[in-house]
Amino acid sequence: YGDGDYCVTQLLRRAETESCIRVPGDQLGAPTSADEVAKVIYRLLEKDAYGLYHAVCGGVCSRYEFARRILTLAGKNTEILKADNAGENGHPSYAVLDNLMLRLDGIELPVSWETALDEYMKNALKEWG
């Protein structure tokens, strides 16, 4: 997520027009901001690293937990319900990558998904007014 019309902005737009939003509670991932990926790319370039690297924020959450935190940080009171439908919409139930190569090369890992989202929302809410 980052600038543009992605999951955060789409969810907030839905919160403006829908009284209740259903979000999968059985699909797990590690939401990662574009800013955190950019920081890792910079560190890889500094180290002149090569190879295949995964770069994801720390921690795991469901899409429901991610959406709940977005709405809370945005001050939205929209009701949000868990929908259990892993696999029905083409999304795997567990989609968490491992930062193994970053750890092996001693490259600083991205922050937790909560910290990254908090920072993103703080800046985005200022920008959005």
Which residue stretches match the model-derived regions?
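A hydrophobic C-terminal alpha-helical subdomain
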Residues: 87-105
